[in-house]
A protein has these predicted regions:
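Core beta-strand elements of the Rossmann-like FAD/NAD(P) dinucleotide-binding domain
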Residues: 1-4, 8
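C-terminal segments that line or cap access tunnels to active or ligand-binding sites in enzymes
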Residues: 104, 126, 142-209
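A glycine-rich dinucleotide-binding beta-alpha-beta segment and adjacent secondary-structure elements
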Residues: 119-121, 129, 140-146, 205-276
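A conserved FAD-binding loop/helix module that cradles the flavin
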Residues: 275-296
Length: 305
């Protein structure tokens, strides 16, 4: 390698690439008959994410701002979405991120920082699955409260190899609400978030016809607990190649993003966080990318001297 190889494949594929190249936990590599080049036990460990759930309600009538919105391209012969022409002029709801209201709060009053982001979305959003983007706008008069739990405690997720075939997907296990991982507080916080949303809905008067998800069958706190444990999702996977000193056996990169025990190899993506940051990780990813670019340029200039 004339300069460097920089891996930016994300929390799932970055550890997969390393392990396929012989960099990772020795026992995991031997299981797939991969020669160990660098024994780094932390590769693929420490997988973290948020906990999120959605509470979906049917409105008695559509919000005037979104009247006629289809949230999808029109079908053949169908009337065009009136909000699309507004978007072309830089106006209307399509110029926003789709959230109409947001609330940041502490799930418990004794917490040092807010840990819940509760925001209202247009459409039917119950999480991420293959057809979720089509389902969001299938019905009119639907409103979703999304609840996101930040500062999660679970660090027990992991990414492993299914095989030595680079075309095979990695084995990903978040170990959501893993017993013994101090995640009971996380679960209680999400439950508190659901109860907060229901109190908000109760105060909306004639706007809401009924809650359709999880619905009337989910009544008490134990019902909510089961709902959250079965339905929570996340989309901020990170921390599988964490940054730390070489004395930390579970760290993978140093403070300049260089992979321990290697030369000319760096990782620059969300996998390097030791702990998942903030509410949304995108700003933190921008920040580490800026730092990495400075480090790479600085090191390259020194090498050229």
């Amino acid at each position: 390698v004339e300069r460097e190889v920089i891996i930016s494949a994300g929390a799932f594929n970055t550890p997969q690439f390393l392990m396929l190249s012989g960099i990772g936990p020795r026992d995991e590599l031997e299981k797939h008959h991969i020669e160990t080049k660098v024994n780094l036990p932390g590769v693929g460990k420490n997988l973290q994410d948020r906990y999120e759930v959605g509470i979906v309600s049917k409105l008695k009538e559509n919000i005037p701002l979104i009247k006629g919105m289809k949230l999808r391209p029109p079908e053949a012969g169908e009337e065009a979405d009136p909000q699309f022409s507004l978007w072309l002029q830089g106006e209307g709801p399509y110029t926003t991120n789709g959230a109409t209201v947001a609330l940041i709060k502490r799930s418990k009053p004794d917490l040092p920082d807010p840990d819940l982001l509760i925001f209202g979305l247009l459409g039917n959003f119950r999480g991420y699955y293959p057809t979720y983007s089509q389902d969001i706008g299938k019905e009119e008069n639907i409103f979703t409260w999304a609840i996101l739990k930040a500062h999660t405690n679970n660090t027990n997720g992991c990414v492993k190899l299914r095989s030595s075939d680079p075309c095979d997907t990695p084995d990903i296990n978040f170990h959501y609400f893993f017993e013994g991982a101090n995640t009971e507080d996380d679960l209680e916080s999400v439950i508190n978030g659901v109860e907060t949303v229901r109190r908000i809905i109760d105060r909306c008067g004639d706007l809401i016809e009924k809650e359709i998800y999880p619905g009337e069958a989910i009544k008490n706190r134990e019902d909510i607990r089961s709902f959250v444990m079965n339905q929570a999702w996340g989309h901020h996977a990170s921390c599988t190649c964490k940054m730390g000193p070489s004395s930390d056996l579970m760290s993978v990169v140093d403070n300049r993003f260089r992979v321990h025990g290697t030369k000319n190899l760096r990782i620059v993506d969300a996998s390097i966080f030791p702990k998942i940051p903030g509410f949304f990780i995108v700003s933190a990813v921008y920040m580490i990318s800026e730092k990495a670019s400075d480090d790479i340029i600085e090191d390259a200039m020194q090498d050229d001297l």
